[in-house]
Amino acid sequence: MSAEEAMHAREEHEARADRLSAPHRERKARGEKHPIEDFLHTYYPFSPGQLRRWHPGWQVGYEASADQAHSGVGDVDSDGCRRWYSDMQLQSGGASGAVRAADLERFARERGDAAYWIHRLLSNSSFAEKPGNFSCFGLHEWAMVYRLGPGEKRHESLPLRLSAEETNRVVEENRLVCSHIDAFRFFTPQAAPLNASRPTRESQPMRDDPACLHVGMDLYKWSMKLAPLLPSDIALDCFEHALDLRILDMEASPYDCRGYGYGIVPIETEEGKREYVRRQRLLADRSDALRTRILAAVEPLVPLFAKSSRPCAS
């Protein structure tokens, strides 16, 4: 890419990223919190500044002079060099300049094991590898409040839709089949033994389910961890998708989110279960399309990652 093309692509990416993070940044400046939307900024370890970093993807090089105006900002240091990138001097028609591209050798050396683990995880959790489980009905959020006492809920700013006794009964009268470690680990001690399995970090690559809302949300995390290898528009697409997943996650939860402008999916009823599955299927298809894009982007690099691979829990 020419410097002009790269700068234009960067500006477009930054503008889109800023639009996506603006509500969170504005709330933070006011000292306010949002129990639904802030999740993507507080649970996942990526700042709005990281989200706005533009990457063309490992297969694209661009004129390094495009970064001059960003010296000392983000991942560009004061000398104009960029972290996780390397420069190659080219000469053409008497003119010379540096072309900047992702530093594959360094990435493989320092992060190849994590990338290999992520590739394995995403490959195993695709619809091409396994059918999705559409019978969990979002009960993980209910298991996280099961038999808790007053003041012990994760989201104290949100009231429960049902009484504590009724909420507990929903857990007891349904089957907990959560397969995702990062949902299961928040189950209350009383709820964990009720789950059909005991997910672990070690078993995650085999257990993650393509229909799981949290597995879909995690695509945002994996796309960010694979920077600068992926085109950064994939990360923004994953972020937007994660917000849609989060909305269903909370609308189907025991919490009453109507005070924040959201609805209710009453999974304690048969009608609510049907609505949850209908929306879950649509979101799972979108998750799988994003997963496919990530895998396609890094597939040629897997042999490079494999050389440095060792057991890794990312």
Language model: regions and residue ranges:
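An amphipathic alpha-helical core segment
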Residues: C178-E275
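Charged/polar positions within long, soluble alpha-helices
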Residues: Y146, M224, M250, P254, ...
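A contiguous catalytic/ligand-binding core that recognizes phosphate-bearing ligands
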Residues: R100-S203
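Active-site acidic/histidine clusters and adjacent loop/turn architecture
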Residues: M1-S123, Y260-A313
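Short, Lys/Arg-enriched charge-dense amphipathic segments
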Residues: E152-A164, S253-I264, R274-L283
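Alpha-helix initiation/capping motif
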Residues: S47, R161-S163, P231, T269
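Generic alpha-helix signal with a bias toward terminal, lower-confidence helices
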Residues: R52, W58, A66, Y146-G151, ...
